[in-house]
């Protein structure tokens, strides 16, 4: 992996700031708050293909322009923990053929709390013999002071030696929040910038009245931190593992005013409007919620037209976006009813064109 252009970090970030400012200008956005990233070792997860070469074994990636593969022995954007694991794991794997045969990918998920999950992906069925070898590997890594979980994956097969999650601890405004992160589920890749996003969101919603609704809350990353600013919080999520992690996180952080329901945004809209009833909502009185603030963090495609209409029903909208172009598409409609009170750029992905942004909208 080539060295990072650290000396150009500020210049590259300024270009992003200028680009986002120009995109938001038609919507009368205030001056951007800009949140910087660490200049290296900021990424908490990484995925690599594995190359087998005459008895040798190493991580590879592909050049996005030329599609040529290149060897990766260290990865400066990834956490120090991932780099140390990469260095130690490969020699240990090579000692046991059953662990390297048909191995085609290695995924790493690390935490600020110094835990790491290593997922080994295979083009073969995993046997008890593989499991025994993987267990021996885990013991060897633990002797090297790694707090490690190993997960084996193959077609229609997943083997956890102990567990498939790691508990992250994020410092936010002087308080530590525990977040259970599940292997192969979405987590924010840049933990340092995630903490800044949470602090910004808490600052926007301070002194809020009423309740908060969050669509697609994942493991509760935002709703758990924001719960302090609201009477009650209602959050939806469709992925079962994320719901389970969110329930753990609610209990672990002592949050008593947050309810997670497993349903899509469309289903939730039907339930709120009384169009149909859902067994999943038994015991939850939707009418007891006075949600006048809504939080959305949609995928790159942004909000679909129906969800935009739903969101416009709320007096205050907190919108986190990973794609400024689709954010602006949505703002064309949203700014007909709301004005942008605050706007922010979060440098989740240094040295790339990707921009994570946030807008805080208030009804006109």
From Swiss-Prot:
GO terms for molecular function: rRNA binding; tRNA (uracil(54)-C5)-methyltransferase activity, S-adenosyl methionine-dependent; tRNA binding. The keyword Methyltransferase applies. PROSITE patterns: SAM_MT_RNA_M5U, TRMA_1, TRMA_2. It holds the Pfam family tRNA_U5-meth_tr. One of its GO terms (biological process) is tRNA methylation. It catalyses: uridine(54) in tRNA + S-adenosyl-L-methionine = 5-methyluridine(54) in tRNA + S-adenosyl-L-homocysteine + H(+); uridine(341) in tmRNA + S-adenosyl-L-methionine = 5-methyluridine(341) in tmRNA + S-adenosyl-L-homocysteine + H(+). Its EC number is 2.1.1.-, 2.1.1.35. S-adenosyl-L-methionine binds at residues 188, 216, 221, 237, 297. Keywords: Methyltransferase, S-adenosyl-L-methionine, Transferase, tRNA processing. One of its GO terms (cellular component) is cytosol. The active site is at 322 (nucleophile), 356 (proton acceptor). HAMAP family: RNA_methyltr_TrmA. Belongs to the class I-like SAM-binding methyltransferase superfamily. RNA M5U methyltransferase family. TrmA subfamily. Dual-specificity methyltransferase that catalyzes the formation of 5-methyluridine at position 54 (m5U54) in all tRNAs, and that of position 341 (m5U341) in tmRNA (transfer-mRNA). This is tRNA/tmRNA (uracil-C(5))-methyltransferase. It comes from Mannheimia succiniciproducens (strain KCTC 0769BP / MBEL55E).
């Amino acid at each position: 992996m080539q060295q990072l252009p650290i000396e150009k970090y500020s210049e590259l970030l300024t270009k992003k700031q200028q680009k986002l400012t120009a995109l938001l200008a038609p919507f009368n956005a205030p001056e951007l708050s800009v949140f910087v990233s660490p200049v290296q070792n900021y990424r908490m997860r990484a995925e690599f293909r594995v190359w087998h070469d005459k008895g040798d074994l190493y991580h590879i990636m592909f050049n996005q322009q030329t599609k040529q593969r290149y060897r990766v022995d260290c990865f400066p954007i990834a956490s120090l923990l991932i780099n140390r694991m990469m260095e130690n794991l490969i020699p240990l794997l090579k000692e046991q053929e059953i662990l390297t045969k048909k191995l085609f990918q290695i995924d790493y998920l690390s935490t600020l709390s110094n835990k790491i999950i290593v997922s080994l992906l295979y083009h073969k069925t995993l046997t008890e013999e593989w499991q025994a070898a993987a267990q021996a590997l885990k013991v060897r890594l633990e002797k090297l002071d790694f707090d490690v979980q190993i997960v084996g994956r193959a077609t229609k097969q997943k083997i956890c030696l102990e567990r498939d999650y790691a508990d992250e601890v994020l410092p936010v405004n002087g308080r530590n929040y525990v977040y259970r992160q599940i292997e192969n589920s979405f987590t924010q890749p840049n933990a340092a910038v995630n903490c800044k996003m949470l602090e910004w969101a808490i600052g926007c919603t301070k002194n809020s009245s009423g309740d908060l609704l969050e669509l697609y809350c994942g493991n509760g990353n935002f709703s758990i931190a924001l719960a302090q600013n609201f009477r009650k919080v209602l959050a939806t999520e469709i992925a079962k593992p994320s719901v389970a992690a969110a329930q753990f996180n609610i209990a672990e952080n002592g949050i008593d005013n947050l309810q997670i329901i497993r349903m899509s945004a469309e289903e939730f809209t039907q339930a709120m409007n009384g169009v149909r009833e859902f067994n999943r909502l038994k015991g939850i009185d939707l009418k007891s919620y006075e949600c006048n603030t809504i939080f959305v963090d949609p995928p790159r495609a942004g909000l679909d037209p129906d969800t935009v209409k739903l969101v416009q029903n709320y007096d205050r909208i907190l919108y986190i976006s990973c794609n400024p172009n689709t954010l602006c598409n949505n703002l064309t409609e949203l700014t007909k009813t709301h004005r942008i009170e605050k706007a922010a750029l979060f440098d989740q992905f240094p040295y790339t064109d990707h921009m994570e942004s946030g807008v805080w909208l208030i009804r006109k």
